[in-house]
A protein has these predicted regions:
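Basic, glycine/lysine-rich polyanion-binding surfaces/domains
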Residues: 1-200
């Protein structure tokens, strides 16, 4: 009997091949890394429970939930504000019990939805990363306006994305729905080609 067991596939399986692409230069303008090892979840606070939720997160993770589009993180766990009473939680790598644990710890305080297999996550860095992102993202990413710890929900080439600045290098994280991974990859690689890019 044929083996018909389902196997998990990365959102960009067959597309994100390691190597150098685009314009030839000594140093690629952008370095692209797909992250497939993160545990992801959305949180929506229950009515009247926001203060209790903040206390529970602080006790469990040592993190103060921030209001507004900012990210708070500690020891590989982060909570990004994505709306009123809403956060996007991430942990990893290898934090396989993060989402079930989050549900248990926040019982009756927040609705927790596992997003680990539902998103494509890309990390981008390099001297020309802002130039590439500026081709499609209508957010001012100049360091005066978008800094480490900032997050925004926006569009790129009609694709809904969440963008976060992870550090001052800068490294940016782009996240979109799994089903739109191919479209996002097509836009990104075409936009980065003139500067040269490396997939790692």
């Amino acid at each position: 009997m044929a083996d018909r067991a389902l196997r998990a596939r990365a959102p960009l399986a067959g597309l994100a091949r390691p190597g150098r692409f685009g314009a030839a230069s000594q140093k690629p303008g952008v370095i692209i890394e797909e992250r497939t090892d993160l545990a992801l979840a959305t949180l929506m606070v229950r009515r009247g429970k926001e203060q209790d939720l903040k206390i529970a997160v602080a006790v469990a993770y040592g993190i103060d939930l921030l209001d507004g589009p900012r990210v708070a993180s500690k020891d590989g766990v982060s909570f990004a504000g994505i709306g009123v009473g809403q956060w996007f939680a991430a942990a990893g790598p290898r934090e396989t019990e993060f989402v079930p644990q989050l549900r248990r710890r926040l019982t009756n305080l927040a609705s927790v939805a596992d997003q680990s297999d539902g998103r494509v996550v890309l990390r981008l860095r390099g001297d020309r990363v802002r130039d590439v992102l500026a081709k499609g993202i209508p957010v001012d990413l100049h360091p005066r306006n978008f800094k480490t710890g900032d997050v925004a929900s926006t569009l790129v080439a009609h694709i809904g994305v969440q963008i976060e600045q992870l550090d001052d290098q800068p490294t940016f994280q782009l996240m979109a729905f799994h089903s739109l991974a191919g479209s996002l990859w097509s836009w990104l690689t075409k936009s980065a080609a003139e500067f040269g890019y490396e997939v790692v």
